[in-house]
Amino acid sequence: MRIKRYAVAAVTAAVLGTVTLATGISSLAATGWVQNGNNYMYYDNDGSLYKGWIQTDDGYYYMDLSTGIMCTGIKKINNALYFFDTDGLMLTGLIHDVSTDKYYYAQSDGTLVIGWLNLDGSYYHMENDGSLG
């Protein structure tokens, strides 16, 4: 009888330990912004990798549809160009890219102007890459 009680206690402890361990592991699932090397990704509350547009109090971010990696620099999305800063925030208005010393202009929806831009009565030609010609 004594051996059976110890065996039952050991099995019960092992089962409870497994349940506790499994619960502990599931609570460690990544949520929110997660850095992986030089890249950032965003995980939903259920732990799934988010892809597409994210709106925060700061503005808009775009997570690549194939990789889920936060976009920076110029990105073509649905045949329109957008400019994201080094923190991934979509920019609007006049943009100076210090790494290339080029200027861009993004409308209020974030799309870069291509072709002629009328800014306060002055006209500027924006190239096909969105940069000032």
Q: Model-flagged regions — what are they?
A:
Residues 2-133:
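Extracellular adhesion/carbohydrate-binding repeat motifs centered on closely spaced tryptophans
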